[in-house]
C-alpha cells in the first residue's frame, strides 16, 4: 500500500482592515499587491491577520519605504507590526509573500565591504547581537543569502529598521546596503534572525 504524498504548505493569505482591531472594510490577499488602495479598495490598512505564510508589508505603494515582517498571527494596530522599530508607521500600502521561508534550511553570509569583499561571517542561526558574536563593525557592506529567508535589524535585540532578505529575490545577493530596501540609508545591521515559517 502506498501512502499519499505529504501536502505542501498552504498558499499565503492575509486579511487587511482599514480600521484598528479588525474593524471596518476588509480585503483578502493571496499574492503580491503593489497598492492596496487601488486593488483592495481600502483607503489605508490599520489591522492585519496573517492566516498562512509569511508576508512583508511596506509603508508605501510599489513595495517602497519601511519594511515590516508579518508572520502568522494577528496585528490589531500599527504598534503590533512596528514593534520596537525606530520608525513607526501607521499605514501599510503594499504587500507580498516572503519566498523560501524555510526556517530549517537557512544560510546567509555577511561581508564587511561592498561587492562581497573583506571579512565574512557565515550564519545558520538567529543572532540577537552581531557585535557580541564577534562581528567587529556595526555595518554590513554586502551579503549573500544561500538558502531560506532572513530579517535583519538595524540594532541589537531585533530592533530598528527591518530588512527582509530572501534567496529568491536578487538571487540572494545584496551587493551594497542600498539594495536592502528603499529605506536603507546606512549599512548598520546589528541583529538577524531566520524568518519563522
Swiss-Prot record:
GO molecular function: identical protein binding; structural constituent of eye lens
SUPFAM superfamilies: gamma-Crystallin-like (SSF49695)
A GO biological-process term: lens development in camera-type eye
Region spans: Connecting peptide: 100-105
Transmembrane annotation, as ranges: none
Entry keyword Repeat: yes
N-terminal arm: annotated segments: 1-11
Family matches, as SMART domains: XTALbg
InterPro entries in the record: Beta/Gamma-Crystallin, Beta/gamma_crystallin, G_crystallin-like
Pfam family, one: Crystall
Keyword Ligase: no
Source superkingdom: Eukaryota
Comment text on domains: Has a two-domain beta-structure, folded into four very similar Greek key motifs.
Annotated family: Belongs to the beta/gamma-crystallin family.
Subunit note: Homo/heterodimer, or complexes of higher-order. The structure of beta-crystallin oligomers seems to be stabilized through interactions between the N-terminal arms.
Noted disease: Cataract 42: An opacification of the crystalline lens of the eye that frequently results in visual impairment or blindness. Opacities vary in morphology, are often confined to a portion of the lens, and may be static or progressive. In general, the more posteriorly located and dense an opacity, the greater the impact on visual function.
PANTHER family, per the entry: BETA-CRYSTALLIN A2, BETA/GAMMA CRYSTALLIN
Protein purpose: Crystallins are the dominant structural components of the vertebrate eye lens.
UniProt name for this protein: Beta-crystallin A2
Origin species: Homo sapiens (Human)
Taxonomic path: Eukaryota, Metazoa, Chordata, Craniata, Vertebrata
Gene: CRYBA2
Amino acid at each position: 500500500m502506498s501512502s499519499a504524498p505529504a501536502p505542501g504548505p498552504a498558499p499565503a493569505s492575509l486579511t487587511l482592515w482599514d480600521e484598528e482591531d479588525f474593524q471596518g472594510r476588509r480585503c483578502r490577499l493571496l499574492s503580491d499587491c503593489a497598492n492596496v488602495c487601488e486593488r483592495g479598495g481600502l483607503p489605508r490598512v490599520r489591522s492585519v491577520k496573517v492566516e498562512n505564510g509569511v508576508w512583508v508589508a511596506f509603508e508605501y505603494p510599489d513595495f517602497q519605504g519601511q519594511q515590516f515582517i508579518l508572520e502568522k498571527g494577528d496585528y490589531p494596530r500599527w504598534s503590533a507590526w512596528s514593534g520596537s522599530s525606530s520608525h513607526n508607521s501607521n499605514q501599510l500600502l503594499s504587500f507580498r509573500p516572503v519566498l523560501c521561508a524555510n526556517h530549517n534550511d537557512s544560510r546567509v553570509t555577511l561581508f564587511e565591504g561592498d561587492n562581497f569583499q573583506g571579512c565574512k561571517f557565515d550564519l545558520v542561526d538567529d543572532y540577537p547581537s552581531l557585535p557580541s558574536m564577534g562581528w567587529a563593525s556595526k555595518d554590513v557592506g554586502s551579503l549573500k543569502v544561500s538558502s531560506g529567508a532572513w530579517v535583519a535589524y538595524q540594532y541589537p535585540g531585533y530592533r530598528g529598521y527591518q530588512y527582509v532578505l530572501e534567496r529568491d529575490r536578487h538571487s540572494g545577493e545584496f551587493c551594497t546596503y542600498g539594495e536592502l530596501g528603499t529605506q536603507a540609508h546606512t549599512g548598520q545591521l546589528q541583529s538577524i534572525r531566520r524568518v519563522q515559517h
